[in-house]
């Protein structure tokens, strides 16, 4: 009897010490290609230890930026990446479905090839079909599946290069055409909860004078080049803007709340004015279609940028 009483006391004490059970992190899987893993920039292997690369290629990319942003505002996300360069959603459905459906993800972010269809630029048919297939597979694993499609950024080579599919049109035209394709795909299944406006944010940055609109003829003084050396993939600034838009779309947090001293931008070589300008662009784009609550900017820290805290 005495033994049982002591055991009961010890059990009660131990439970009290444990305290409330911490809520599980929100799981997010990013499915994409070089536009997600950050080809052509320092973003590709940035903080790769903070995300799970399901293909074991050691890449951080935009998912690692997203993870960093969430940590800085006190949010807990378990972030994973599954990518293959030069592919669309069709490749992942055909070759990686068993990997993708290994767990019931809370949120999945996916995008296809940058021209909608590598063989038929501007044609959304394959995107629509394979987005539906992906949605069905995710729902079979998780009845509450939440798939977000990402309307990718426009390409300078496809718009200004004479062999480009959008040659003779504007960079905004390509962004609009790509967005229209993703809007069609989003209508294919109720599992698809929305389209993240990455391409439109890029065009907004150009219209606002933050970024240059044509990297093929050089970069205007005082403006950012969102493309890297091949005029196809993004620069650090381009991927950074994409990361901010994804961050706001998934968390509904004002990107400006990260402040001009945001540590990942600092580590990747962006200046405080550049970081603030890109955050403002992301906010202006997101507020058009998301219930983003404006951050009290006057309360942001004014300290000089510092390195990000170690991964946890």
Task: Enumerate the language-model features and the residues they cover.
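Positively charged n-region of N-terminal signal peptides that target proteins for export
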Residues: 1-5
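Bacterial N-terminal signal peptides
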Residues: 7-17
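Sec/Tat signal peptide C-region and signal peptidase I cleavage site
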Residues: 18-24
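Short polar catalytic/cofactor-binding loops
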Residues: 32-37
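Conserved SGNH/GDSL esterase-like catalytic core that processes O-acyl groups on lipids
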Residues: 38-129
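Alpha-helical cap/lid subdomain in secreted, periplasmic
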Residues: 100-236, 248
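Conserved catalytic region of serine esterases and O-acyltransferases that act on ester linkages
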Residues: 216-312
């Amino acid at each position: 009897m005495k033994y049982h009483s002591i055991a009961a006391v010890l059990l009660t004490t131990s439970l009290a010490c444990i305290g409330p059970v911490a809520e599980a992190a929100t799981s997010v899987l990013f499915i994409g290609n070089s536009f997600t893993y950050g080809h052509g920039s320092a973003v590709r292997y940035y903080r790769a230890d903070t995300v799970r690369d399901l293909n074991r290629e050691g890449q951080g990319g935009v998912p690692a930026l997203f993870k960093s942003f969430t940590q800085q505002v006190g949010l807990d996300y378990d972030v994973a990446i599954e990518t293959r360069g030069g592919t669309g959603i069709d490749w992942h459905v055909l070759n990686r479905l068993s990997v993708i459906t290994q767990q019931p993800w809370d949120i999945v972010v996916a995008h296809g090839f940058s021209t909608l269809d590598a063989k038929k630029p501007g044609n959304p048919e394959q995107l629509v079909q394979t987005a539906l297939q992906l949605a069905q597979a995710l729902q079979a694993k998780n009845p509450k599946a939440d798939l977000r499609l990402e309307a990718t950024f426009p390409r300078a080579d496809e718009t200004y290069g004479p062999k480009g599919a959008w040659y003779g049109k504007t960079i905004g035209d390509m962004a609009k055409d790509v967005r229209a394709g993703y809007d069609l795909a989003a209508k294919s299944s109720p599992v698809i909860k929305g389209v993240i406006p990455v391409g439109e944010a890029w065009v907004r940055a150009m219209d606002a004078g933050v970024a240059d609109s044509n990297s093929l003829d050089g970069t205007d003084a005082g403006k950012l080049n969102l493309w890297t050396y091949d005029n196809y993939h993004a620069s650090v600034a381009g991927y950074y803007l994409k990361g901010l838009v994804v961050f706001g779309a998934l968390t509904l947090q004002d990107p400006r709340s990260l402040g001009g001293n945001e540590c990942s931008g600092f580590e990747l070589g962006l200046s405080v004015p550049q970081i603030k300008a890109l955050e403002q662009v992301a906010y202006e784009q997101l507020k058009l279609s998301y219930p983003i609550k404006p951050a009290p900017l006057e309360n942001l820290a004014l300290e000089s940028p510092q390195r990000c805290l170690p991964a946890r």
